[in-house]
Amino acid sequence: MAGTGKTVTRVDLCEAVYQKVGLSRTESSAFVELVLKEITDCLERGETVKLSSFGSFMVRKKGQRIGRNPKTGTEVPISPRRVMVFKPSAILKQRINGQQANGKMNGESAPSEFSAETE
């Protein structure tokens, strides 16, 4: 599943569970579907879904406001609605930016406590 520009699908997630966990393909598919359904159900109820070291999915209410049609410039009322928001954890942000949890770039060695400088 690694790579740039690739979209990961349910099938990809099921295959990863199959390869890494050892469940059958049918069980892997059922497992992924169950997890996604549970997340969806929680969000539908307005609950926040917090996944440690990954991030939080939450539902926010947006009030009614006036928007503008970009083609005509006409003002258009936008109805109140709920939107889903994802807030990544600090750990996920660091990993995406190629950093380890200690703030170092991946591949950089951490300074040794016992290194001595000679002049």
Curated annotation (Swiss-Prot):
Q: Tell me the segments the record calls region Disordered.
A: 96-119
UniProt record similarity statement: Belongs to the bacterial histone-like protein family.
Q: Which GO terms of the cellular component aspect does the record hold? A: cytosol
Record key words, sorted: DNA recombination, DNA-binding, Transcription, Transcription regulation, Translation regulation
User: What's its job?
Assistant: This protein is one of the two subunits of integration host factor, a specific DNA-binding protein that functions in genetic recombination as well as in transcriptional and translational control.
Recorded protein name is Integration host factor subunit alpha
Q: Which Pfam families does the UniProt record give?
A: Bac_DNA_binding
Q: What SMART domains would the database entry show?
A: BHL (SM00411)
Q: Which InterPro entries match?
A: Hist_DNA-bd, Histone-like_DNA-bd_CS, IHF-like_DNA-bd_dom_sf, IHF_alpha
Task: Quote the NCBIfam families the UniProt record gives.
Answer: himA, PRK00285.1
Single GO biological process annotation from the record: positive regulation of metabolic process
Gene Ontology MF annotations: DNA binding; structural constituent of chromatin
Keyword check for Iron: no
- Signal sequence span is none
Cross-referenced SUPFAM superfamilies, in alphabetical order?
A: IHF-like DNA-binding proteins (SSF47729)
Q: Subunit details for this protein?
A: Heterodimer of an alpha and a beta chain.
